[in-house]
Amino acid sequence: MEKLLLGVVGVGHLGSLHTKMLLDISNVHLVGIHDIDGAKAQKIAAEFGIRSYDTLDDLLGQVDAVTIATNTMAHFEVARTALQRGKHLFIEKPVTETIVEAEELCRLAREKKLIVQVGHIERFNPAILALDRYEIRPMFVESHRLAQFNPRGTDVAVVLDLMIHDIDLILSFVKSPVARVEANGVAVVSDSVDIANARIQFENGCVANVTASRISQRKMRKMRLFQRNEYISLDFSEGLAEVFRLVEGDEPSAKGTMKLGELGSGKHKRIVVYEQPEVKDVNALKYELELFVKAVRHKTKPLVTAEDGRRALEVANAILEKINQQKLQL
């Protein structure tokens, strides 16, 4: 099978990482890159020994698919142009600035039967991949995503920059529509919200309490899932998953299970166990790009679809709307 011809649009910090990873994927031929900053594109092209294209149209004329790592404001125009030219897309999160734009990309992708994968990278975190043998059905979720201040990314609110990772994960876990959103947030050092907290209620009764900050003294990327007979703790920075379960007395134990205690007796006896699922040693960015390539080559549904990106953006925008309403009341 011939190699997939790929291009990268936008070669800032993340686009440079795309370039590096794609060069290391065996069934991909990285045709070249494009950036509105021509000097930057030429510098990156020289660094990796590839070609820099002066215009987006020139690059699109040579490829089967592109990855889009521009700033968020440019996502829609670049993506729409690529889809209209019949190109498959890997587009970084958030998928677009507005729901209307996201819906248009979803429509175009369906109409032209093209693959669109959104770069919600935490779906490919080793901690998440380690849960593949567990049934995830949380009724309460607590997440904290805290980062030290970095001017890169402040073109959007922290809800769209950081919190959207957790929003996407929670939506993938909770198979129920969102019923209500409450939120508060503050712009501390930038012109947009730098710290935010949201409470997301679902129709099935699940509640998610989500906090994100880009002005923290220390870093943290953790999530806790509480469900019937099970508590799951995830550390995305460490790629670690820990599971505390209540099991029947005669249920076989998985490898690496530690008994913590017992409840009841006889046929009613249940055991509290601790498990640390084996994690896969993967580079999350490379892995999600590999799966995008696989989806394009085999014409299969990607793990994170354009519709997934739209849903995450819809909830993120609802959170921002609530924060703005709070401001107006002050």
Positions of predicted regions on the chain:
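C-terminal helix-rich "cap/oligomerization" subdomain common to oxidoreductases
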Residues: A65-T67, Y287-L330
